[in-house]
Design a protein with these regions (language model features):
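Intrinsically disordered, low-complexity
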Residues: 21-108, 174-180
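Generic structural signal for secondary-structure transition and capping sites
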Residues: 111-112, 166
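Catalytic and binding regions of secreted/periplasmic enzymes and modules that target cell-wall glycans
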Residues: 118-124, 128-180
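A generic structural signal for short
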Residues: 91, 115-116
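Short, histidine-centered active-site or binding-site loop motifs used for metal coordination
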Residues: 110-111, 138
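Secretory targeting and sorting signals
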Residues: 1-28
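Structural recognition of the beta-strand scaffold that forms the well-ordered cores
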Residues: 104-108, 114-115, 123-127
């Protein structure tokens, strides 16, 4: 036998509770709450910027952690906007590695970006030694290359290129792409 519950009574109860809540209860934030939220945004944008810079192998942007010593909402907004801008710039640079076309050509003849099969991982088929040497930060943070984004994999390969290895870790595919 099916039990029927009175929906009208439930809706009336919810409606009366909604009217009982004071108008300002969920309203505007205090300046302390706004400052706290701004500091959290600054920290988030800074962490994103530094992560991207580390992946690219460039020095991270310096900071004085001014937001920890200042209470001015206007200054905190300016700092937030500055770090947001830096994070956007770092992201744009991250997704455009210098030899992107070459890495995409090599990838075309290698595996999927998410290839989990040992001994070679990811779209550029990097072995553990290669990942440890040129992508230690990502290997520790995310695991093997199949868990990295395509941009992170290309920047790891870019570090090997800068170190003088050239495209030789991919001898056959680099030859197909006209890189050797």
């Amino acid at each position: 036998m099916k039990v029927r519950r009175p929906r009208g009574l439930l809706l009336a109860l919810i409606g009366s509770l909604a009217l009982a809540v004071p108008a300002g209860a969920g309203g505007a934030q205090t300046s302390d709450e706004m400052a706290y939220a701004l500091v959290k945004e600054i920290e988030q944008h800074r962490a994103q910027t530094w992560h991207r810079q580390r992946v690219m192998g460039i020095r991270r942007t310096r900071t004085t952690f001014l937001e920890r010593r200042v209470g001015s909402l206007e200054l905190l907004r300016q700092l937030r906007d500055t770090w947001r801008r830096r994070a956007v710039i770092a992201r744009k640079r991250l997704v455009r590695p210098p030899h992107r076309a070459a890495w995409l050509c090599i990838h075309r003849y290698e595996g999927s970006w998410k290839d989990p099969n040992a001994p070679y991982y990811g779209g550029l088929q990097m072995d553990i030694t290669f990942q440890r040497t040129y992508g230690r930060y990502l290997l520790r943070r995310k695991g093997t290359a199949n868990r990295w984004t395509p941009a992170e994999q290309m920047w790891t390969a870019e570090k090997a290129l800068r170190a003088g290895r050239g495209f030789y870790p991919w001898p056959n595919t680099a030859r197909h792409c006209g890189l050797l």
